[in-house]
Structure formats: structure tokens, C-alpha cells
């Protein structure tokens, strides 16, 4: 039986990351100028995806900027999440998606996002085994972390408008400071 075809879908929205070790899970997202980095350890089958809006980081922690919008924060969270689930850094491999130029009159933040992801992964010694970035259309992405398989669909018309609106909406809400997470 093809476990990928019958997989449980987990959506990753802007400002989030997910780490899984279940071969029946497919991670999915919709990207415009945002970038999703998909990382996995092929030996353990642990993998994950993030979805970030901007490269770099907030200028200062006290500025009130939401760190989950930034690639540097979400890349660190994804890598640390993989390591906590048993992945080894020296075996990690990556695929990068997104970074489209969805609005021609604005600066090309999509290109900056893709360049940031490439540079970050290279600096961390993580091998990039696949990439589909740039262009002027959004993408719908599906990623099977256990196998490393990825599939994307170009978004046009109404779908592209929806992706652009998602890029411009607020990131996932921050957890309440007094909340407790149980493992």
C-alpha cells in the first residue's frame, strides 16, 4: 500500500513549523513570497517544514516584532525540533520552496527569502537536495518528510490571489506567556 497517497494532511501556516516522524503524514502549505524549508534525516525518517515571511530577524527583541515572521528564528526552531526527535545534524537534507515575486511593484522579498534560506543552510552545513524558488506565481506545496518526496502546484488566478493574501495576513499567534505545554 502506498502510505503517501493515504496520508494525514497537516497544514503549516505562516509563522509555524512542524516536525513529524509518522510516515503517514504529509505536510502542506501555500506560498507566495514566503519560503518553506523542508528538512529531514533520511535514516530516522524524522522531518519537518517551516513557513517564513521575511529573512533575517527582528531588529531588537524589545521592538515588539513577532519573531515567528523571520526565517532565522523558524530555521533554528525547525532544526532544533528535528534534533529533539532523534535526527542527526550531519544527516539532515533540505528542500526549499517559494520566494515568488507576487507583486511586481514591491521589493523582491521572495528572492531575499530564498537567498536567506540557501545561505543559512550552507552556513549550517545542511545539504540542499532540491529547490524550486522564484517565479511570479505562488505554489501549493506537499511534503512527505519520511521519504523526502515533495510535490508542488503552480497557483494562478484566484488561487494566486489567495496566496498573496495569506502572505500579507498576520503570522500564527504567539503562545500565551503563562501557557504550559505538555509532552
Swiss-Prot record:
SUPFAM superfamilies on file: CNF1/YfiH-like putative cysteine hydrolases (SSF64438)
PANTHER family noted in UniProt: CHEMORECEPTOR GLUTAMINE DEAMIDASE CHED-RELATED
Encoding gene (name): cheD
Catalytic activity: L-glutaminyl-[protein] + H2O = L-glutamyl-[protein] + NH4(+)
Family: Belongs to the CheD family.
Keyword Iron-sulfur: no
Organism: Sinorhizobium medicae (strain WSM419)
Name of the protein in question: Probable chemoreceptor glutamine deamidase CheD
Enzyme nomenclature, EC number: 3.5.1.44
UniProtKB keywords: Chemotaxis, Hydrolase
GO biological process entries: chemotaxis
Pfam families found in the cross-reference section: CheD
Role description: Probably deamidates glutamine residues to glutamate on methyl-accepting chemotaxis receptors (MCPs), playing an important role in chemotaxis.
Domain of life: Bacteria
GO MF assignments: protein-glutamine glutaminase activity
Amino acid at each position: 500500500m502506498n502510505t503517501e497517497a493515504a496520508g494525514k494532511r497537516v497544514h503549516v501556516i505562516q509563522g509555524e513549523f512542524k516536525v513529524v516522524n509518522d510516515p503517514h503524514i504529509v505536510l502542506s502549505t501555500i506560498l507566495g513570497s514566503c519560503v518553506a524549508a523542508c528538512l529531514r534525516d533520511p535514516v530516522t525518517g524524522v522531518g519537518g517544514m517551516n513557513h517564513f515571511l521575511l529573512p533575517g530577524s527582528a531588529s531588537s527583541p524589545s521592538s515588539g516584532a513577532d519573531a515567528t515572521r523571520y526565517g532565522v528564528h523558524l530555521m533554528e526552531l525547525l532544526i532544533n525540533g528535528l534534533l529533539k526527535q532523534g535526527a542527526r545534524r550531519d544527516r539532515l537534507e533540505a528542500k526549499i520552496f517559494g520566494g515568488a515575486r507576487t507583486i511586481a511593484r514591491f521589493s523582491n522579498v521572495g528572492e531575499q527569502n530564498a537567498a536567506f534560506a540557501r545561505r543559512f543552510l550552507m552556513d549550517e552545513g545542511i545539504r540542499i537536495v532540491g529547490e524550486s524558488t522564484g517565479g511570479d506565481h505562488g505554489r501549493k506545496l506537499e511534503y512527505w518528510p519520511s521519504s523526502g518526496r515533495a510535490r508542488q502546484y503552480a497557483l494562478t488566478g484566484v488561487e494566486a490571489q489567495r496566496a498573496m493574501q495569506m502572505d500579507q495576513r498576520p503570522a500564527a499567534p504567539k503562545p500565551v506567556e503563562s501557557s504550559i505545554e505538555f509532552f
